[in-house]
């Protein structure tokens, strides 16, 4: 390496688009790269949520016009190669103009043309797959990437370039106190079990409709915090209207401080998106995962199995969420010692240093 190369800050182009599941881990890595003196730019789509999320992050955005090519429609399939080619050339133009040294792809439509562009220009590519089942774009890019990061073990075939890093998570989640201390403190104080239900920003109708009747059948004292989405507050509250005296219920449209919610929960009931599973493990909380049944390649079930297989969580498929099944499941779980053991196992399988790990791999390219 020449003196001029050593003095020039490394320029890393991030590629992540479409959903928070792709964008948030990439942003965590980008911010740490900036803290280490790297130049960071972002390859985005014109209409993706990444544009809004990056608005005040001091990261320049470069857009390429690309949409999903997976799906039906003859015209769409015929046009796809031309759209990919055009987007690839646009990405190449940006990379040459910016003198990009390394590219880090975190998924979304933008990563395909961006990864191909980097490969054609001889720029090293790192990809990061958040789910336990690789998405279409990352599965293709794994063949040409220099480094392949997986959040969950065995997502990709074993190889020298495959590294299990975990998913980058926010600092406030990694700073949560140990589950053993939290659960023991609540037990010694004689507090009721805290049940946290999280349906995501829009809420999960199946959770909102099926969980209240089942929870009302339980005989033990419970504090229930049910995040149901803005549009489903009244309907969810109505289902708890005749709750017995042993239940204290709060129905919330959204939760602003998830770190606090995790730290206070004895049991969380939620979907099994990659970042949710990662945060549950990092926080150290016993969980019941209800995988989204329409998730591509059923990847949420695969995500949930990461913790279920080590005794840190239970999986309840939405199709089996009958009152009888839920009652049996919850009756078993209303045991603080069991929940403590599950939470400790969850924390044992977390990778709280994922952000630093990925950043280190990028710096070495």
From Swiss-Prot:
One of its GO terms (molecular function) is UDP-N-acetyl-D-glucosamine:N-acetylmuramoyl-L-alanyl-D-glutamyl-meso-2,6-diaminopimelyl-D-alanyl-D-alanine-diphosphoundecaprenol 4-beta-N-acetylglucosaminlytransferase activity. It comes from the Bacteria. CDD domains: GT28_MurG (cd03785). It is a peripheral membrane protein. Its EC number is 2.4.1.227. It catalyses: di-trans,octa-cis-undecaprenyl diphospho-N-acetyl-alpha-D-muramoyl-L-alanyl-D-glutamyl-meso-2,6-diaminopimeloyl-D-alanyl-D-alanine + UDP-N-acetyl-alpha-D-glucosamine = di-trans,octa-cis-undecaprenyl diphospho-[N-acetyl-alpha-D-glucosaminyl-(1->4)]-N-acetyl-alpha-D-muramoyl-L-alanyl-D-glutamyl-meso-2,6-diaminopimeloyl-D-alanyl-D-alanine + UDP + H(+). It is found in: Cell inner membrane. InterPro entries: GlcNAc_MurG (IPR006009), Glyco_trans_28_C (IPR007235), GlycoTrans_28_N (IPR004276). Pfam families: Glyco_tran_28_C (PF04101), Glyco_transf_28 (PF03033). One of its GO terms (biological process) is peptidoglycan biosynthetic process. PANTHER family: GLYCOSYLTRANSFERASE (PTHR21015:SF22), UDP-N-ACETYLGLUCOSAMINE--N-ACETYLMURAMYL-(PENTAPEPTIDE) PYROPHOSPHORYL-UNDECAPRENOL N-ACETYLGLUCOSAMINE TRANSFERASE 1 (PTHR21015). HAMAP family: MurG. Belongs to the glycosyltransferase 28 family. MurG subfamily. This is UDP-N-acetylglucosamine--N-acetylmuramyl-(pentapeptide) pyrophosphoryl-undecaprenol N-acetylglucosamine transferase.
């Amino acid at each position: 390496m020449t003196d001029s190369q050593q003095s020039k800050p490394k320029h890393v182009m991030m590629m992540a688009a479409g959903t928070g599941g792709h964008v948030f881990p990439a942003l965590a890595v980008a911010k740490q790269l900036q803290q280490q003196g790297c130049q960071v730019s972002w390859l985005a789509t014109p209409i993706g949520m990444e544009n809004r999320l990056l608005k005040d992050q001091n990261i320049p955005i470069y857009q390429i016009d690309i949409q999903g090519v997976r799906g039906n429609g003859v015209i769409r399939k015929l046009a796809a190669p031309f759209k990919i080619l055009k987007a690839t050339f646009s990405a190449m133009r940006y990379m040459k103009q910016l003198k990009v040294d390394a590219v880090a792809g975190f998924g979304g439509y933008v990563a395909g043309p961006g990864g191909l562009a980097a490969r054609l220009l001889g720029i090293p590519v790192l990809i990061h797959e958040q789910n336990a089942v690789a998405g279409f774009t990352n599965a293709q890019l794994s063949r040409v990437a220099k480094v392949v990061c997986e959040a969950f073990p065995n997502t990709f075939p074993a190889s020298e370039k495959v590294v299990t890093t975990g998913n980058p998570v926010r600092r406030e989640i990694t700073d949560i106190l140990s589950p053993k201390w939290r659960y023991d403190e609540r037990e010694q104080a004689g507090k009721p079990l805290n049940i946290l239900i999280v349906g995501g920003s829009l809420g999960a109708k199946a959770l909102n409709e099926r969980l209240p009747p089942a929870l009302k059948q339980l005989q033990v004292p419970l504090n229930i915090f049910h995040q149901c989405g803005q549009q489903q507050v009244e309907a969810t509250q109505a289902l708890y209207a005749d709750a017995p005296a042993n239940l204290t219920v709060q129905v919330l449209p959204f939760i602003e401080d998830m770190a606090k919610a995790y730290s206070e929960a004895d049991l969380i009931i939620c979907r099994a998106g990659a970042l949710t599973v990662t945060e549950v493990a990092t926080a150290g909380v016993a969980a019941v995962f209800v995988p989204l049944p329409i998730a591509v390649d059923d990847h949420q079930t695969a995500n949930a199995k990461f913790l279920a297989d080590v005794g840190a969580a239970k999986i309840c498929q939405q199709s089996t969420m009958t009152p009888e099944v839920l009652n049996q499941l919850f009756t078993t779980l209303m045991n603080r010692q069991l929940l403590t053991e599950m939470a400790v196992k969850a924390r044992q399988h977390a990778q709280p240093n994922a952000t630093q790990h990925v950043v280190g791999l990028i710096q070495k390219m």
